[in-house]
Amino acid sequence: MKIKMLMAFVALLLFSAFTADHTITIFMIGDSTMANKSLEGGNQERGWGHVLGGYFSENIRVENHARNGRSSKSFIDEGLWEVVINKVKPGDYVFIQFGHNDEKVDEKRHTDPGSTFDANLRRFVKETRAKGGIPVLFNAIVR
């Protein structure tokens, strides 16, 4: 029930910003809980972003840039954020969901709540807004 309500809210949000001359793109950035997964070998694991595009018409495109094992820090450090932000156009959405891997102890992924984690989220929001995009923050979901 919660997922249906979330999808209805997202659809309403997107349709309220729709203009006929612009295909809206939803850019997704996050970790494995959002990421697309290989379907080979009967793999049944899916991130929620894997199926999101199926809820929209051809006027709304979903680009899922979420990757397994990424934290907000590693997403930036690996250049994945730069790829996304360079594509954002006015009216596009950036769905942001990190947290699980930010708590890892290794220095390539670790961020501190109230400090580096918050700064990374603020960066995503600020840079998205600067391009005319609409940032949407999601809490980390249960794995």
Region spans (language model):
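Intrinsically disordered, low-complexity Ser/Thr/Pro-rich tracts
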Residues: 2-3, 89
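Bacterial Sec-dependent signal peptides at the C-terminal "C-region" and cleavage site
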Residues: 3-23
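Residue-level marker of positions within ordered structural domains that often coincide
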Residues: 8, 57, 99
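Serine-esterase "nucleophile elbow" of acetyl-processing enzymes
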Residues: 19-66, 82-90, 94
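Alpha-helical cap/lid subdomain in secreted, periplasmic
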Residues: 21, 79-143
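Active-site-proximal beta-strand/loop segments in catalytic clefts of secreted hydrolases
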Residues: 29-33, 64-70, 96-101, 138-142
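Acidic/histidine-rich helix-loop elements
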Residues: 35-46, 66-75, 104-112
